[in-house]
Amino acid sequence: MKVLLVFDFDNTIIDDNSDTWIVQCAPDKKLPIELQDSYQKGLWTEFMGRVFKYLRDEGVKADELKRAVTSLPFTSGMIELLSFLRMNKDRFDCIIISDSNSIFIDWVLEAAAFHDVFDHVFTNPASFDSSGRLTVKNYHAHSCTRCPKNLCKNTVLGEFIDKQLQKGVRYTRIVYIGDGGNDVCPVTFLKKNDVAMPREGYTLHRTLAKMSQNLEPMESSIVVWSSGVEIISHLQFLIKM
């Protein structure tokens, strides 16, 4: 049986937020104040829809967005980690669950030739309309009160595990690699053999530390990382167990 690796994308695989990164395509590399102030909590995808409309209205073309997105740096050690996983696909299945969008993730994975590492990518579907505007839809509707309106990562992970079980695929454990507040929900549902891997110093790490102080126990083990090379070391340890 394999290990399932679940990756976030922004600030995990890549070392920034792809949505905020493309603001560099705007005039003077910033958004108008009224557009910045239009964000409402939990409605990030709707906000980004307005950002993409503004960029289109300012004459920003798809190839400019692509140049910006594919210039995003990978997080330290992540290229080494993804290369390690490619060489060990017999031991690991890898999926991405991300609040970014399908076009940005495709661009990054294609430019770096890492598409083959991942078995599935779950994210907000995106496309360019006839006017050249990038449009992004919510991934799904859900009833989770802890997550943004467009995506509950725990629901997505649970549905994926169920579908794999229906195909007769079981995993020895789940390793969840992430950084953000929207990674808290799926991580808290991990089981005893599973591993939560929060990026050091980021929201997920701080939240799990606070939960520990408040004696809110988690079933899974927690392994903090700051480089993909550290993740490789832990995965090598797991497959030797």
Curated annotation (Swiss-Prot):
The gene is Phospho2. The active site is at 8 (nucleophile), 10 (proton donor). InterPro entries: HAD-like_sf, HAD_hydro_PyrdxlP_Pase-like, HAD_sf, Pase_PHOSPHO-typ. The lineage of its organism: Eukaryota, Metazoa, Chordata, Craniata, Vertebrata. The keyword Ribosomal protein does not apply. Mg(2+) binds at residues 8, 10, 179. PANTHER family: PHOSPHATASE, ORPHAN 1, 2, PYRIDOXAL PHOSPHATE PHOSPHATASE PHOSPHO2. Keywords: Hydrolase, Magnesium, Metal-binding, Pyridoxal phosphate. The keyword Nucleus does not apply. This is Pyridoxal phosphate phosphatase PHOSPHO2. Its EC number is 3.1.3.74.
